Swiss-Prot record:
Gene that specifies this protein: rpmD
Protein's name in the database: Large ribosomal subunit protein uL30
Gene Ontology molecular functions: structural constituent of ribosome
Record HAMAP family: Ribosomal_uL30_B (MF_01371_B)
Assembly notes: Part of the 50S ribosomal subunit.
Keywords: Ribonucleoprotein, Ribosomal protein
Length: 62
């Protein structure tokens, strides 16, 4: 299964609480922090909710 590298590129300051919680649930803490997640429906939904704050790259599943 493919994996996604998600990077927080914009700050959550001034964003609604739901977006802050979604970023936290993805495992992102500070700007420019990255996590590698499984490519599944749940993660895709969270990424879509905060797509204006993050960048997503597909990485090889090793």
């Amino acid at each position: 299964m493919a994996k996604l590298q998600v990077t927080l590129t914009r700050s959550v300051i001034g964003r609604p609480e739901t977006q802050r919680k979604t970023v936290e649930a993805l495992g992102l803490k500070k700007t420019n922090s990255s996590v590698v997640l499984e490519d599944n429906v749940a993660n895709r939904g969270q990424i879509n909710k905060v797509s204006h704050l993050v960048t997503v790259e597909e990485v090889d599943a090793k």
